[in-house]
Amino acid sequence: MTTLLAAGWPVLIAALVLGYACGAIPFGLILTKFAGLGDVRAIGSGNIGATNVLRTGRKGLAAATLLCDALKGTLPVLAASHWGEGPALAAGLGAFLGHLFPVWLGFKGGKGVATFIGVLLALSPVTLAAFAAIWLGLAFALKYSSLSALAASAATPLILWALGHGAVAALFLVLAALLWWKHAPNIRRLAAGTEGRIGKKG
């Protein structure tokens, strides 16, 4: 704990704010508006993430949203890592909170999967590979994107802990809990058998 706080509270707070400022950029909304598609919040789930952008029929735009939402998790963490591990973790938390609760949109943001991935890429690429393997395996077998993301996110802190990254594991325990909370509607649909499957239209 002492090591994590070594940079001092002003630096930790600055890293948190930096992360939040990056995470709060609503790329899904910005890209769809620039593409002349209107407000993405008015279609599908009303979410600003890549999955809902895909419902516009623009795969390239959805891919760009996914990439940008991931990078806004990766870049502030990498920048803050120059100050130490504590600031890097603070920036990761800030980026994730910014994506979920952007001040510009009345604190109504995305569900966090892409930004979760982006933060994980910066802090533990090896664990990201495990995340991807779990997601792809379940997505291929069960055809549920949400279930795959939920399972992979739940496994992430356990994998990090097993690898000896206690502080990072603690951060991702918090991020995974928030991700599950934001996916509450998906969890209810999964339980009811009404969740949409990958590749299914309508």
UniProtKB/Swiss-Prot annotation:
Pfam families: G3P_acyltransf
Record-level Gene Ontology MF annotations: acyl-phosphate glycerol-3-phosphate acyltransferase activity
Enzyme Commission code: 2.3.1.275
Disulfide bonds: none
Membrane topology, as annotated: Multi-pass membrane protein
Keywords for this protein: Cell inner membrane, Cell membrane, Lipid biosynthesis, Lipid metabolism, Membrane, Phospholipid biosynthesis, Phospholipid metabolism, Transferase, Transmembrane, Transmembrane helix
Reaction(s) catalysed (UniProt annotation): an acyl phosphate + sn-glycerol 3-phosphate = a 1-acyl-sn-glycero-3-phosphate + phosphate
Cellular localization per UniProt: Cell inner membrane
Any one annotated GO CC term: plasma membrane
Transmembrane spans: 11-31, 87-107, 116-136, 158-178
Main location: membrane
One of the GO biological process terms: phospholipid biosynthetic process
Pathway this chain belongs to: Lipid metabolism; phospholipid metabolism
Function per UniProt: Catalyzes the transfer of an acyl group from acyl-phosphate (acyl-PO(4)) to glycerol-3-phosphate (G3P) to form lysophosphatidic acid (LPA). This enzyme utilizes acyl-phosphate as fatty acyl donor, but not acyl-CoA or acyl-ACP.
PANTHER family from the UniProt entry: GLYCEROL-3-PHOSPHATE ACYLTRANSFERASE-RELATED, INNER MEMBRANE PROTEIN YGIH
Family classification: Belongs to the PlsY family.
Oligomer and partners: Probably interacts with PlsX.
Protein's name in the database: Glycerol-3-phosphate acyltransferase
Protein's organism: Methylorubrum extorquens (strain PA1)
Lineage: Bacteria, Pseudomonadati, Pseudomonadota, Alphaproteobacteria, Hyphomicrobiales
